[in-house]
Amino acid sequence: MTETRYVTTPIYYVNDKPHVGHAYTSVAADVLARWWRLQGHEVFFLTGTDEHGQKVEKAARDAGMDPQAFTDKVSQHFRDLTGTLGLSNDDFIRTTEARHKAACSALWQELAKRDEIYLGHYEGWYAAVSYTHLTLPTICSV
């Protein structure tokens, strides 16, 4: 048996409906998953949605909806996209699902047990538009 391959798309932000960029990355991941399957590899292909963040909160507020109801609605568009494109994904995960929260909690606990989590110091600004943390040297170099 050959080694297992893991393929994932980005987990897409649900601040708006899918667009051609989402389709592009999804199809690219699907092509890779199918290619590896044709080569005899066991493949696990994951896609899904990231339902946290300031952009998502703002989009829900702008739509006049409860954040969970908003993410339920928009996430369904992404799930539908997998069928529309005929993707061969094995799973679709949402970051608001209990199984995702449980996995994150277990990972955190394991890292804490190994002393891999520590308090540090960070100074900078967060640009919600680009999901980027910026430091003063970065800003000054632009």
Model-found features: residue ranges?
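Basic phosphate/pyrophosphate-binding loop/patch that engages nucleotide-derived ligands
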Residues: A112
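Short, flexible, mixed-charge glycine/proline-rich loop motifs
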Residues: E116-E123
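N-terminal catalytic cores of NTP/NDP-binding nucleotidyl/phosphoryl-transfer enzymes
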Residues: T2-V74, D91-Q109
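Conserved small/polar residues in nucleotide/adenosyl-binding loops
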Residues: T132-T138
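Residue-level detector of anion-binding/catalytic polar loops
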Residues: E42, S88, I117
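A glycine-rich helix N-cap at a beta->alpha junction
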Residues: F78-S88
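Short cysteine-rich clusters marking metal-coordination/redox-active sites
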Residues: A127
